[in-house]
């Protein structure tokens, strides 16, 4: 029996199927500034999660779901769960409860596969110490899965995307390249174990280390790529940044995928959106920029500060824009 290729049932894959950043910002432009008195982090700066003060605790809320990024149902569930939980970690929080969000083409794909997806999500929730309780399902022509997650944090120690300060280093906690490898997997069926391992690894420990060392600014690198998420942070913080492309960690197989043309449409749209903000050295190539704009799924944390064991890839500067060297 031929295994079911879940990625063949989706027009995009993972966070690469996000609505392009420029279009999304235009769609929500009239919705910013609608905050209540207890809202600590709202929609204005497009941070990773909402934060509301309840008593002396910051309650965090986020939702994230996407179409299949790999063909293995259990791994897709694990990846989607790690990706959803990441928004809580990126704010310096601890997830306390999650609910499933799933769309399933029930007349096309067996429900046993849906069970495997949910089982993968439950496994990662258990690893995170976050109960996964129920959720919501719909009959959907395209399979989709993710979670809505609630977390808690110290309101005085939140990691925010509007708190970057000039002079501080930039650290990245996971390698880039999973977007390229996921696109190659979708088109060829090749399985890249390193990409799956990266996407299923929780950002919990990196976030805890950042909070413990007094970091104030961070975000996670997902569908808008490193350059896109860095641009959002710089814009929110009213600063600029310098990136040393040679210092950016990359899954080695992704370089081959880039050479062979497995660049997603989402990655190209990311680069189109952020290009006006870039200043590049003369030896920086278009392929360099495509790699830095690669649409990640369950990527690492981009931290303004140093974290032991993770590479410094640049620094924050006064001014605006991003220098790529």
Task: Please name every model-derived segment.
Residues 54-70, 78, 94-191, 315:
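Glycine-rich anion-binding loops of enzyme active sites
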Residues 50-61, 200-206, 271-282:
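Acidic-glycine-rich active-site phosphate/pyrophosphate-binding loop
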Residues 74, 191-198, 216-217, 287-292:
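Short pre-catalytic strand/loop immediately N-terminal to key active-site residues, enriched for Gly-Thr
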């Amino acid at each position: 029996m031929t295994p079911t290729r879940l990625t063949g049932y989706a027009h995009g894959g993972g966070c690469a199927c996000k609505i392009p950043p420029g279009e999304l910002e235009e769609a929500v432009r009239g919705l910013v500034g609608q905050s209540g008195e207890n809202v600590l982090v709202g929609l204005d700066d497009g941070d990773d999660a909402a934060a509301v003060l309840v008593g002396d605790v910051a309650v965090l809320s986020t939702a994230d779901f996407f179409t299949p990024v790999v063909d293995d149902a259990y791994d897709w569930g694990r990846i989607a769960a790690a990706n959803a939980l990441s928004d809580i970690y990126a704010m310096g929080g601890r997830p306390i409860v999650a609910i499933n969000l799933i769309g399933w083409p029930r007349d096309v794909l067996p429900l046993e596969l849906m069970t495997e997806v949910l089982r993968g999500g439950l496994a990662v929730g258990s690893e995170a110490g976050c109960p996964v309780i129920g959720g919501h399902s719909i009959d959907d022509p395209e399979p989709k899965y993710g979670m809505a997650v609630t977390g808690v944090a110290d309101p005085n120690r939140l990691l925010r995307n509007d708190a970057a300060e000039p002079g501080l280093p930039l650290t990245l906690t996971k390698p880039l390249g999973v977007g390229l490898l996921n696109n190659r997997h979708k088109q060829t069926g090749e399985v890249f174990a390193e990409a799956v391992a990266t996407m299923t690894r929780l950002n919990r420990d990196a976030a805890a280390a950042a909070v413990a060392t007094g970091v104030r600014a961070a975000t996670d690198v997902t569908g808008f790529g490193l350059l896109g998420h860095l641009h959002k942070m710089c814009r929110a913080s009213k600063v600029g940044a310098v990136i040393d492309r040679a210092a950016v960690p990359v899954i080695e197989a992704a370089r081959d995928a880039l050479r062979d043309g497995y660049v997603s449409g989402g990655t190209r749209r990311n680069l189109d959106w952020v290009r006006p903000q870039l200043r590049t050295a003369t030896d920086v190539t278009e392929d360099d920029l495509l790699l830095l704009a690669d649409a990640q799924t369950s990527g690492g944390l981009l931290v303004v500060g140093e974290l032991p064991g993770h590479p410094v890839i640049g620094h924050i500067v006064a001014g605006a824009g991003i220098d790529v060297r």
